[in-house]
Amino acid sequence: ILSEYDIILVQEVRDADLSAVNELMNQLNSAGGHPYSFVISIPLGRTSYKEQYLFIYRSDMVSVLGSYYYDDGCESCGTDTFSREPFIVKFSSPTTQVQEFVLVPLHSEPSHAAQEIDALYDVYTDVVNKWRTNDIIFLGDFNADCSYVTSSQWPSIRLRSLRACEWLIPDSADTTVADTTDCAYDRIVACGTALRQDIEPGSATVNNFEKKFHLQTKDALAVSDHFPVEVTLKAQ
């Protein structure tokens, strides 16, 4: 699954010493395909339970230009916005029409999903001010559906109504592997005129690897309980 992509965001990584990440990278790079590198956040979270954001990328296609953590306030005071604040990465991509873009990951806290998704508007403003670009992709498990974000909450979520941005994975999508759920938890939101024009029409989709590899649900769930969501940028 990973080797289908040039850049992948992996979430819920709990591997402070990077032993599992290094093993994964060794397997990915020994598969004989393309060379992959990675950039990973520190463990993030308000309690002893912490997660890392991991970006794996094809080093012959793209490179990392910079990264920073969004400052969402005082964690110890309990006034921070995000359970796992975005680890924001700027990529150089010489082969696509847009040659630089920014990726902003979010794995939201389910019980505060609407507030956290709304706060991505402030992250948008922060990136624009810091890096002078709005060619930004927000992506990740936003928990943006079903009981966590209801239809009545969407109108107050600022990122949803931001004219510069387009929600590429619709509310009708099902990004969950389980047969018992039908939720569009995982999203890709593309911002900026140049970046949005660079999106291959119809390419934003859910990668249903269960169907693709003819797996039983229990075997698919052993890979992940979510399907990847994906989008393609046009080559020059």
Give, region by region, the residue ranges found by the protein language model.
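Divalent cation-coordinating acidic motifs and surrounding scaffolds
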Residues: 1-236
